[in-house]
């Protein structure tokens, strides 16, 4: 039943987003690299990419499955290098959804990406891990408390000159906080279930609106600079107080 509801909602949201905010392209505003969530691939992100292209962003959607965070980070490295080569001098924004936000942050932190990426926008990101990853065959390293997650979150979560943004719904299962400087956009209104919110984020007009703000360096929420080590995995989970709801 839930799968059918999500598919129906996805189709409706795609239809809405497909007509939202798309007109004549504006002058070149930089490069956007979109990194999908687990299992999704590129297709659900194409309407979002089309909307950004119409607003003047040279947008690339990566076709990654999110099964291996470090491997995906190396793919992101290659994609960003290619985008910079194709658009010399243009700022690069890296936008990751769900586990795609983790592979994007691994790239920024471990592969030198923070030296070349101007802004990082995480959508529905389990930055300190997700219980849903525990015991699954795909990217089990995203389970809270694994050595991988401990290493990813050791020291400064927001290194370099990159600016860091977080987008999530009111009932997201993980609040997406990072220590160091981060803009936390005001959580958008829930559809009624955090899991549904999370799955549909790539095609929700509310997410597009907040992404526009982030790409324009407008912190439509709260800028927070938490000290290193102030965040624990448990403190990031179920900020609405409704587990898995």
Question: Positions of the model-derived regions?
Answer:
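Secretory targeting and sorting signals
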Residues: 1-25
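Serine-dependent carboxylesterase/thioesterase catalytic core
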Residues: 27-36, 43, 51-64, 70-157
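Structural motif
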Residues: 37-38, 169
